Curated annotation (Swiss-Prot):
Active site annotation, chain numbering: K77, S152, S176
Role of this protein: Allows the formation of correctly charged Gln-tRNA(Gln) through the transamidation of misacylated Glu-tRNA(Gln) in organisms which lack glutaminyl-tRNA synthetase. The reaction takes place in the presence of glutamine and ATP through an activated gamma-phospho-Glu-tRNA(Gln).
Gene3D superfamilies attached to this UniProt entry: Amidase signature (AS) domain
Keyword line: ATP-binding, Ligase, Nucleotide-binding, Protein biosynthesis
Organism: Streptococcus pneumoniae serotype 4 (strain ATCC BAA-334 / TIGR4)
Family stated for the protein in its record: Belongs to the amidase family. GatA subfamily.
Pfam families: Amidase
InterPro entries the UniProt entry points to: Amidase, Amidase_CS, Amidase_dom, AS_sf, GatA
Assembly behavior: Heterotrimer of A, B and C subunits.
GO biological process, one term: translation
GO molecular function: ATP binding; glutaminyl-tRNA synthase (glutamine-hydrolyzing) activity
E.C. number(s) listed in UniProt: 6.3.5.7
HAMAP family from the UniProt entry: GatA
Full protein name: Glutamyl-tRNA(Gln) amidotransferase subunit A
């Protein structure tokens, strides 16, 4: 059996009734991964041995009937630490790095009985929006293998969309969960900053990074967030979890809910078919009883510029630790200490990572700090204030997740600015530390279109409520790419 069309709750019932074992489900999942891997390249490491050991232990202990995730396989983005499983951040720099600890999010998932089946491919050090900067080769879109899957959580999204796994973890610094979720037609949530511990996440932009869940449906996404969210003394930016159950509002109607539609999110640079899809979605929300009104987020247009100064500056600092001395790649042609540093970093990092390190170092350098980094911080505050003004009167914000559907592989690699602009609609959410979700809302040119819902801090349950109401009255989430295959 493949089980790839079974929901988490259906799988849980099969496990509790002992119609299948955790080992059988894990073996089937591993076969799903292997059978699709040549077409997608969505995994860096398939952790077969470790997964089967975990599954056997769960079978021996018995499935927890009160825990819907007990015995359920999970794929983890390759920048999230996993004890005893290679964690490379898809970089030559960390080609041989095997952590001796689990990230808190992974540890939380394991505590719930989840089984880590592998580490998913990604843009190197989470720097990229197409899944093409990986040292291990580009990931392919689940719907069309000549298209990008989005990034940086490319493998995590493609793996869920293709039926390799039901659930996966990604990280989102400027849209890296939501954009690949949109491009692959699944549900991806970037939680409020601090909701999921960053301990064990290989840092890119520390004021922006957040771990979050991928799933085929809204409820399954919320169930995974339930498992991984926690306050953590090991992460000074983590916050108390204010919601006992993120599924609590799923199934409730949205009559009277006020939803804002920013005019800037449907302006210049938005594909006409994407715009039409989002406007149709807005009408659908109105049919469900919500009140949808146009608003303005005037400083959102500066989001990309602000982000690439702040994120690159934080990256240039965070990546200083990779020097060829302590762990990771060390150049063999170095004859002195300076050459070890220079050659190891030059050879170990890919072009996009080096570009961002240089941009960040420049922004922080003497004479340019005030003009760039300090100014970016000031404009970031204006972006936050724009959101606060809107959320004083509205429950949620609605818009497209990305300006277009997935584009051709290798079409923007030589135009980094064009690729950066693809994050135009997701970046402001990270700058403000807000929660945002992408859900399937239609198709254009045979490819999925993602709808983004944004809420004020700690409003994930309201986001899930609205997303689930849309999902329950549409069938976009039920449509699957050819590679998904049948179920038996």
């Amino acid at each position: 059996m493949t089980f790839n069309n079974k929901t988490i709750e259906e799988l849980h019932n099969l496990l509790v009734s002992k119609e299948i074992s955790a080992t059988e489900l894990t073996q089937a999942t591993l076969e799903n991964i292997k059978s699709r891997e040549e077409a997608l390249n969505s995994f860096v490491t398939i952790a077969e041995e470790q997964a089967l050991v975990q599954a056997k232990a769960i079978d021996e202990a018995g499935i927890d009937a009160d825990n819907v995730l007990s015995g359920i396989p999970l794929a983890v983005k390759d920048n999230i630490s996993t004890d005893g499983i290679l964690t490379t951040a898809a970089s030559k720099m960390l080609y041989n790095y095997e952590p001796i600890f689990d990230a808190t999010a992974v540890a939380n998932a394991k505590t719930k009985g989840m089984i880590v089946v592998g580490k998913t491919n990604m843009d190197e050090f989470a720097m990229g929006g197409s899944g093409e900067t990986s040292h291990y080769g580009a990931t392919k879109n689940a719907w069309n293998h000549s298209k990008v899957p989005g990034g940086s959580s490319s493998g995590s999204a493609a793996a869920v969309a293709s039926g390799q796994v039901r659930l996966s973890l990604g990280s989102d610094t400027g849209g890296s969960i939501r954009q690949p979720a949109a491009f692959n037609g699944i549900v991806g949530l970037k939680p409020t900053y601090g909701t999921v511990s960053r301990f064990g996440l290989i840092a890119f932009g520390s004021s922006l990074d957040q771990i979050g869940p991928f799933a085929p449906t809204v409820k399954e996404n919320a169930l995974l967030l339930n498992a991984i969210a926690s306050e953590d003394a090991k992460d000074s930016t983590s916050a108390p979890v204010r919601i006992a159950d993120f599924t609590s509002k799923i199934g409730q109607d949205i009559k009277g809910m006020k939803i804002a539609l920013p005019k800037e999110y449907l302006g210049e640079g938005i594909d006409p078919e994407v715009k039409e899809t989002i406007l149709n979605a807005a009408k659908h929300f109105e049919k469900l009883g919500a009140i949808v009104e146009e608003v303005s987020l005037p400083h959102s247009k500066y989001g990309v510029a602000v982000y690439y100064i702040i994120a690159s500056s934080e990256a240039s600092s965070n990546l200083q630790r990779f020097d060829g001395i302590r762990y990771g790649y060390r150049a063999e042609d170095a004859t002195n200490l300076d050459e070890i540093y220079v050659n190891s970093r030059s050879q170990g990092f890919g072009e996009e990572v080096k570009r961002r390190i240089m941009l960040g170092t420049f922004s922080l350098s003497s004479g340019y700090y005030d003009a760039y980094y300090k100014k970016a911080g000031q404009v970031r505050t204006l972006i936050i204030q724009d959101f606060e003004k809107v959320f004083a009167d509205y429950d949620l914000i609605l818009g497209p997740t990305a300006p277009s559907v997935a584009y051709d592989l290798d079409s923007l690699n030589h135009d980094p600015v064009a690729m950066y602009l693809a994050d135009l609609l997701t970046i402001p959410v990270n700058l403000a530390g807000l929660p945002g979700i992408s859900i399937p809302a239609g198709f254009s040119q045979g490819l999925p279109v993602g709808l983004q819902l944004i809420g004020p801090k700690y409003s994930e349950e309201t986001i899930y409520q609205a997303a689930a109401a849309f999902e329950a009255t549409t069938d976009y989430h039920k449509q699957q790419p050819v590679i998904f295959g049948g179920d038996n």
